[in-house]
């Protein structure tokens, strides 16, 4: 009888732990500053680009401002927010022979690692996917309206944000070089379905799974 009570207590404790982990993953944002800047620079670049003609007649000033915001967004997403929000990181390395290698790192799942929250993962991927699509719309609208002076800026926006999207998809897919076969399904699942919290792990400098190309 005593052993049965002990077993019941252990089962209840185990379920309680699972409920705590589930509640944590569904908790509110744990990295508010990183989440804010993940969206701030890219949204600010879009808003500035759209409203430039309304608030300023200086093409050069608008061009420099939008390009600065795009550059800050590229750096912060590549070096900070991806590592903090979803535990992914990509970068380039030059070896001793002078050859360039692209490194794609993803935090390994371990019992000691803490998963990122669903809200952070969802914000990260949606912001990463939707904003380049908006710049693609700007590309066609600029082309068809013959505002060719803005075309270089729009191409820069597409290039910088698509580079981060491409790099993080490769991180997520384990550095799979055949990116064409997996991109479409990944994007559709990210946009239209709830992100799986177990897929996104808190970053760290240890236990990283590294893929080189």
Swiss-Prot record:
Swiss-Prot/TrEMBL GO biological process terms: protein secretion; vesicle-mediated transport
Record's keyword terms, sorted: Membrane, Transmembrane, Transmembrane helix
Membrane-spanning ranges: 32-52, 54-74, 123-143, 150-170
Gene Ontology terms: cellular component: Golgi membrane
Location relative to the cell: Membrane
Keyword presence, Magnesium: no
Matches recorded under InterPro entries: TVP23-like (IPR008564)
Membrane topology: Multi-pass membrane protein
Family: Belongs to the TVP23 family.
Listed name of the protein: Golgi apparatus membrane protein TVP23 homolog A
């Amino acid at each position: 009888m005593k052993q049965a009570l002990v077993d019941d207590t252990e089962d209840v404790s185990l379920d309680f732990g699972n409920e705590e982990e589930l509640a944590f993953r569904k908790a509110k944002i744990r990295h508010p500053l990183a989440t804010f800047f993940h969206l701030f620079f890219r949204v600010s670049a879009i808003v500035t680009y759209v409203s430039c003609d309304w608030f300023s007649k200086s093409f050069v000033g608008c061009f420099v401002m939008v390009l600065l915001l795009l550059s800050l967004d590229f750096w912060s997403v590549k070096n900070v927010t991806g590592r903090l929000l979803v535990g992914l990181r990509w970068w380039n390395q030059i070896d001793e022979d002078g050859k360039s290698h692209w490194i794609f790192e993803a935090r390994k799942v371990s019992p000691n690692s803490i998963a990122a929250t669903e809200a952070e993962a969802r914000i990260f991927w949606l912001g990463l996917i939707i904003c380049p699509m908006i710049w693609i719309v700007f590309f066609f609208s600029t082309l068809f309206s013959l505002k060719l002076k803005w075309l270089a800026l729009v191409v820069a926006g597409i290039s910088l944000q698509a580079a981060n999207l491409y790099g993080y998809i490769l991180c997520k897919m384990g550095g799979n070089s055949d990116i064409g076969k997996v991109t479409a399904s990944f994007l559709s699942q990210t946009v239209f379905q709830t992100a799986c919290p177990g897929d996104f792990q808190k970053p760290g400098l240890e236990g990283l799974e590294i893929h080189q190309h």
